[in-house]
Amino acid sequence: MIQVEKAHEPAVATEVAYLPAVAAFKKDYDDEMRVSVVRGDAMTYFRVADHKDRDTHEFFLEFDGKRVTDSNQTLEQLMGRDRRHARFNLIEQITPGDA
């Protein structure tokens, strides 16, 4: 049996912006990395977490102006094979609790 090695793809330069932070989170990821890992790493960097007080606070990633709804997909699945840079926004969604 002959094994064919997958050509090593260059890393995906990933950047996540979050307001009100002044600096973006930047890290290179393999294109097979799941979007959920990028979200988790960015949330750790910005020291934020999903939580509930009177309201429910949830964080999600936005890519190309659209909310990323499937965080189990890889960067390659999200952006395509040849794209080597990803710019996300980390957005906080606040859902009001019962008054």
Identify what each model region corresponds to:
Residues 1-99:
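Ubiquitin system architectures
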